[in-house]
């Protein structure tokens, strides 16, 4: 009893298998939650514990937005909340045009010398904070659908970060 794959004449696959190696590539360093941003940086050879500062820095780089030493970049997601519960993490698959309008409105109403909003793609945007404290606990919305939004708002890890968390 053999499977179709075992019976098939597959010299190229057999050669690749004979010359290749099997193994496990660990792309998530100890202490980090599994996520594409961590895995991708690890695969590209970055020392994640030394350089990773969150999705915001990746978002800024992809948008060509410079982040100074005294600034922090935060990913700013548009999401859907219904009756206080996170309905979905993508703002109902919002279009780029609708999203840009919302982010530019936020910049007009809330932006100042310390806080700036930058439109990105669909629900993924950038918030740049000058002089903010990075000791924050941020929960990615895609990890918590169905959760009360109040339970997963940004939280300060220590007292010094309270002002930044309250933004």
Each predicted region: which residue ranges?
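Glycine-rich, mobile lid/loop segments that gate access to catalytic sites or pores
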Residues: 90-167
């Amino acid at each position: 009893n053999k499977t179709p794959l075992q019976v098939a004449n597959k010299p190229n696959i057999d050669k690749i298998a004979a010359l290749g190696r099997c193994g496990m590539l660990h792309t998530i360093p100890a202490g980090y939650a599994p996520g594409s941003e961590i895995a991708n940086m690890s695969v590209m050879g970055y020392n994640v514990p030394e350089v990773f500062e969150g999705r915001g820095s990746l978002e800024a780089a992809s948008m060509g937005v410079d982040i100074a030493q005294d600034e922090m970049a935060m990913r700013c997601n548009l999401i859907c909340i219904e009756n206080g519960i996170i309905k979905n993490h993508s703002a109902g698959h919002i279009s780029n045009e609708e999203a840009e309008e919302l982010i530019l409105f936020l910049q007009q109403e809330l932006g100042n010398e310390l806080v700036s909003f930058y439109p990105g793609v669909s629900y993924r945007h950038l918030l740049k904070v000058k002089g903010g404290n990075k000791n924050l606990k941020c929960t990615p919305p895609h990890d918590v659908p169905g959760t009360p939004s109040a339970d997963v708002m940004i939280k300060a890890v220590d007292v010094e970060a309270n002002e930044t968390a309250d933004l």
